[in-house]
């Protein structure tokens, strides 16, 4: 459940007609969407994103802090102390402070990393940036990466007036070819996929 202070922030944002650019699913997506809506009204999406990034960097540099956030046995009092300490140390945006309080209240501080990742999807969409990944068996060289990037940017998968944010993910198990994922669409051109399809056809023929 969300805390009352966060609910009030979301309600105020909803009245202003602020609508998240994309729909997210899962508990982390719900929290990220609530933060986006609240930040749009109370401060700004950019301020919340900046605070989340600063928070992410702080946690990444401190393995002890990471362990604390992921510890479900932490008492409610200790969780609140952690949140207060982080808020003061980083000077967090108010909407992000409220988010941390909600996560602490519900013993879900371990979701912070996932919420941050989901929030990035919202801010990218908000700024007209389309996230995409191209998965290959080996890293793409810069020339081939740019060719794939250019082709995707001009395709209907991205759309006019939008920018592309492409990432190359390496998975040797696909054996060759590539898998392109843009938003919720996937184009699987991997060798592994072709082999699976061939095996399926052979099984059906027997």
UniProtKB/Swiss-Prot annotation:
F-type ATPases have 2 components, CF(1) - the catalytic core - and CF(0) - the membrane proton channel. CF(1) has five subunits: alpha(3), beta(3), gamma(1), delta(1), epsilon(1). CF(0) has three main subunits: a, b and c. Signal peptide: none annotated. It comes from the Eukaryota. Gene3D superfamilies: N-terminal domain of the delta subunit of the F1F0-ATP synthase. InterPro entries: ATP_synth_OSCP/delta_N_sf (IPR026015), ATPase_OSCP/d_CS (IPR020781), ATPase_OSCP/dsu (IPR000711). This is ATP synthase subunit 5, mitochondrial. Belongs to the ATPase delta chain family. Keywords: ATP synthesis, Hydrogen ion transport, Ion transport, Membrane, Mitochondrion, Mitochondrion inner membrane, Transit peptide, Transport. One of its GO terms (molecular function) is proton-transporting ATP synthase activity, rotational mechanism. GO terms for cellular component: mitochondrial inner membrane. Mitochondrial membrane ATP synthase (F(1)F(0) ATP synthase or Complex V) produces ATP from ADP in the presence of a proton gradient across the membrane which is generated by electron transport complexes of the respiratory chain. F-type ATPases consist of two structural domains, F(1) - containing the extramembraneous catalytic core and F(0) - containing the membrane proton channel, linked together by a central stalk and a peripheral stalk. During catalysis, ATP synthesis in the catalytic domain of F(1) is coupled via a rotary mechanism of the central stalk subunits to proton translocation. It is found in: Mitochondrion; Mitochondrion inner membrane.
């Amino acid at each position: 459940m969300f805390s009352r202070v966060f609910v009030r922030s979301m309600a105020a944002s909803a009245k202003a007609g602020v609508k998240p650019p994309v729909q997210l699913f899962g508990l982390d997506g719900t929290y990220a969407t609530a933060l986006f809506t609240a930040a749009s009204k109370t401060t700004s999406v950019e301020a919340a994103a900046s605070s989340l990034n600063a928070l992410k960097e702080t946690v990444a540099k401190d393995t002890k802090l990471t362990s604390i956030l992921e510890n479900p046995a932490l008492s409610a009092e200790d969780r609140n102390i952690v949140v207060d300490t982080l808020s003061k140390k980083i000077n967090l945006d108010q909407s992000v402070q409220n988010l941390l309080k909600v996560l602490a209240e519900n013993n879900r501080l371990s979701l912070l990393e996932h919420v941050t990742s989901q929030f990035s999807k919202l801010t990218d969409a908000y700024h007209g940036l389309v996230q995409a990944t191209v998965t290959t068996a080996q890293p793409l060289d810069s020339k081939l990466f740019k060719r794939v990037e250019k082709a995707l940017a001009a395709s209907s998968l991205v759309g006019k007036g939008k920018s592309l944010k492409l990432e190359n993910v390496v998975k040797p198990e696909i054996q060759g070819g590539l898998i392109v994922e843009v938003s919720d669409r996937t184009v699987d051109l991997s060798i592994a996929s072709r082999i699976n399809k061939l095996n399926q056809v052979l099984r059906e023929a027997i």
